[in-house]
Amino acid sequence: MARDDPHFNFRMPMEVREKLKFRAEANGRSMNSELLQIVQDALSKPSPVTGYRNDAERLADEQSELVKKMVFDTLKDLYKKTT
């Protein structure tokens, strides 16, 4: 990381700072480098999306559920007729 990279002030509880310091020492990094590594690792993993991103996604999900129910009901009716 270059000196001209953006700076960011970050407050954390003392116990978290101590854990970060211990982890950084164990990994042979500065606390800044360790914190950056933790953030990069977290951002590289896909995060689960909770809720709907917009109305179109919500509507698509509702329509999908309706279609599933229609297919299920149709198959159930067809099965009843064959037995």
UniProtKB/Swiss-Prot annotation:
InterPro entries: Arc_DNA-bd_dom, Arc_rbn_hlx_hlx, Phage_P22_Mnt, Ribbon_hlx_hlx. Keywords: DNA-binding, Repressor, Transcription, Transcription regulation. GO terms for molecular function: DNA binding. GO terms for biological process: regulation of DNA-templated transcription. Disulfide bonds: none annotated. Belongs to the p22 arc/mnt family. Mnt acts as a transcriptional repressor of genes ant and arc. Binds DNA as a homotetramer. This is Regulatory protein mnt. It comes from Salmonella phage P22.
